[in-house]
Regions:
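Conserved SGNH/GDSL esterase-like catalytic core that processes O-acyl groups on lipids
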Residues: 43-133
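Charged helix-capping and loop-helix junction motifs
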Residues: 128-137, 175-178
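Loop/turn elements at helix/coil->beta-strand transitions in domains of secreted/extracellular proteins
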Residues: 51-54, 108-113, 145-150, 188-192
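Substrate-gating cap/lid alpha-helix
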Residues: 160-196
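Hydrophobic membrane-insertion alpha-helices, especially the h-region
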Residues: 1-8
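Sec-exported extracytoplasmic/periplasmic mature domains
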Residues: 67, 118, 135, 139-146, ...
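N-terminal, intrinsically disordered, polar/charged segments of Gram-positive cell-envelope systems
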Residues: 9-54
Length: 197
């Protein structure tokens, strides 16, 4: 539950950082003598409640946990414990009948799609296969939801004990390498990299 709570905080943090970056980019393009905008009262609870309306979360057990604990209201969840980028093209959710990625072709238009993959792929022999299949998954998501903003989450670190035991390459060194691959993939696909490491 603590990890799920942290992810919810990271989702909000990523959203805030994306908005801050957008504001900085707008500021850089502004005139030398900008006009002062009227003061606006910000209600962060309104932002938090509405930010995830018409959003979809797709991924592994992290997404499954978010769904089970109802941490993000107003979103749809398409998850399966142990799901990886390859299985998302062929396996259904635990309650579904179509492959996970096909759930985005449900007639609903999403504003945002949050994809959480990578941890189950850390032990793959070839990281190029991970990048290739994740890229295909992104392309499929774009084909179904062409106007949605897509976010790729970084893999969160593991405890020192888990990292030191290096079970199936689930260690922080490997996670950092895969996060760099996810970041580069996000750049090449024109989607957002959400650094929650």
């Amino acid at each position: 539950a603590l990890v799920i709570f942290a992810i919810k905080g990271c989702v909000s943090s990523v959203s805030q950082r994306a908005e801050q970056k957008r504001q900085e980019e707008l500021a850089a393009m502004s005139t030398q003598t900008p006009t002062t905008a009227p003061a606006q009262k910000s209600n962060s609870s309104d932002i938090d409640q509405n930010y995830y309306q018409n959003s979809a979360f797709i991924g592994n057990s992290f997404v499954d946990g978010m769904m089970n604990y109802s941490l993000v209201e107003g979103a749809d969840y398409f998850a399966r414990i142990g799901l990886n980028v390859n299985d998302a093209m062929t396996k259904s959710t635990s309650t579904g009948t179509v492959p996970v990625i096909e759930e985005l072709n449900n007639g609903k238009q999403y504003n945002k799609i949050f994809m959480i993959f990578g941890e189950n792929e850390l032990g793959w022999a070839n990281s190029d296969t991970f990048v290739e299949q994740y890229g295909a998954l992104i392309d499929k998501a774009k084909s179904y939801q062409s106007t949605a903003k897509i976010y790729l989450f970084a893999i969160t670190p593991v405890t020192k004990e888990v990292s030191d035991n290096n079970v199936d390459n689930t260690n922080n060194e490997q996670i950092v390498k895969y996060n760099e691959l996810i970041k580069k993939l996000a750049e090449s696909k024109g989607v957002v990299y959400a650094d929650v490491y």
